Amino acid sequence: FSCSSEDECQFMHAMVADSPLGPFMNPTCFYKRFSIDSHVVETEKGLFLWYSEDNKDCVRIGTRVFVDKLIDPMTPANQPREMIVPTMDEEIFKRGRNGDKDWHTIEGAFWFFEGEWQYVMYSGGCFDNDSYHIGYVAAHSQKSDLTRVQFVKHTNNGKFAPVMYKNDFEEGSGHHSVIKYKGQYYAIYHARDLDCQKRNEFDEARTARVCKLHVNDGVITAERYSDHI
């Protein structure tokens, strides 16, 4: 989890417990810097942590996705590799946020594999408006060391081609998890009804939703409906 204090802004931590019901105790700080959206997976090479942090030493500055090896569940190797970076204006979080530069956001990574392909889905843009979307990168690879896999962002000939984006009934679609049930993939995500009205800037209008995902040979598509799965 990530949390803030007077001197810390969204530093990533982990806690331990003898039961999933808790109590969780003894927090350990993984990174003494902004670090969010942890997603731990296990392969034959061990545990890997997908997460997001900032990079200002680049052309498209902002938040992007990294992966780091975990020595054990409470100890990162602290050798993160940048895996998914902003490449287009549709991934802008806020224009002019950092002086004369636009701030981009790629966050909420979720890794899984199907057949001979590995996928990392992510959320991009700004969660608070209709730019928020879900995209993915894919790799035709059997490598178990996820820091060495070369993922390629899915686009339409280099242009914006998200799996999920605003449609005629919802916006702000993102920050999802993926499950496979009886051979069918599903995305559990949040979004807002397109016609919702916020009472004020602090009103949270997003709700949890489910849709089918179709995953085949490096391509992911979503099947969304307003009234059923």
Which residues fall in each region the model found?
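Carbohydrate-active catalytic/glycan-binding domains of CAZyme proteins
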Residues: 1-229
